[in-house]
């Protein structure tokens, strides 16, 4: 009789498990709130970001077991992360950073996974314009410096001149690469505990 009791409990537990493993339906609004919360919690930024705009997703299926995508824009607020204030209390910074974000929800995974990718608005175009302006400014500056140092360098050997040119190129290359490293898109992936 005891064996039958435990077998019954085991069958009930196995039958009840799939229902508890399925994710709870997530509306589009809840998915956006969760994405903003994940970004603020994992991005390592000093300021909190708030939803500025969301692209409507009419094909969003709250009970989907597959992957779903959402697109939205975040803007930097005046609140700091360590203040732990509600986002509704935080106003946007006048010159705050604006981020274009794409979120991917993978509900077929156990537990569900969200991956966010955020890029500063106008990042590539502005970066190219800044590089061109910097190159022009550096070229003008180099010409002025060359004119001033022209008399001094006449006395220097060719080897010293070559080293100076080489190190200028290295310095420019390092600056350029550092700018690219720090302007890469932020990608965050987390599991969602339901």
From Swiss-Prot:
> Which InterPro entries does the record associate with it?
Cathelicidin-like, Cystatin_sf
What is the protein's name according to its record? Crotalicidin
Q: Where is the composition biased (Acidic residues)?
A: 125-145
Disulfide linkage: 79-90, 101-118
Spell out the GO cellular component terms annotated for this protein, sorted alphabetically and separated by semicolons. extracellular space; membrane; other organism cell membrane
Purpose of the protein: Potent antimicrobial peptide against Gram-negative (P.aeruginosa, K.pneumoniae, E.coli, A.baumannii). Shows moderate activities against Gram-positive bacteria (E.faecalis, S.aureus, S.pyogenes). Also shows antifungal activity against standard and clinical isolates of yeasts (MIC=10-40 uM) and dermatophytes (MIC=1-5 uM). Adopts an amphipathic alpha helical conformation, that may allow to partition into the target membrane. Shows high toxicity towards human fibroblasts (micromolar ranges). Shows low hemolytic activities on human erythrocytes.
Q: Name one Pfam family in it.
A: Cathelicidins
Q: Which residues form the propeptide?
A: 23-164
What family name appears in the similarity comment?
Belongs to the cathelicidin family.
Cite a single GO BP annotation: defense response to fungus
List where in the cell it is found.
Answer: Secreted; Target cell membrane
Q: What else is known?
A: The putative mature sequence has been predicted by AMPA, a predictive algorithm for identification of peptide stretches with antimicrobial properties.
Q: Could you say which residues form the signal peptide? A: 1-22
Q: Where is this region: Disordered?
A: 125-156
Which stretches does UniProt call biased (Basic and acidic residues)?
Answer: 146-156
Nucleotide-binding found in the keyword field:
no
């Amino acid at each position: 009789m005891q064996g039958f009791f435990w077998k019954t409990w085991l069958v009930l537990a196995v039958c009840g498990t799939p229902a508890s493993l399925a994710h709870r339906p997530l509306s589009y609004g809840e998915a956006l709130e969760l994405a903003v919360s994940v970004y603020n919690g994992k991005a390592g930024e000093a300021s909190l970001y708030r939803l500025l705009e969301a692209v409507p997703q009419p094909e969003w299926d709250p009970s989907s077991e597959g992957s779903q995508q959402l697109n939205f824009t975040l803007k930097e607020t005046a609140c700091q992360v360590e203040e732990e204030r509600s986002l509704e209390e935080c106003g946007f910074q006048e010159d705050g950073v604006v981020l274009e974000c794409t979120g991917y929800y993978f509900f077929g995974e156990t537990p569900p996974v969200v991956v966010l990718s955020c890029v500063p608005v106008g990042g590539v175009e502005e970066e190219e314009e800044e590089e061109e302006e910097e190159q022009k400014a550096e070229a003008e500056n180099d010409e002025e410096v060359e004119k001033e140092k022209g008399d001094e360098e006449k006395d220097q050997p060719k080897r010293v001149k070559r080293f100076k040119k080489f190190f200028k190129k290295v310095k420019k290359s390092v600056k350029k690469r550092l700018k690219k490293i720090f302007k890469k898109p932020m990608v965050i992936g987390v599991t969602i505990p339901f």
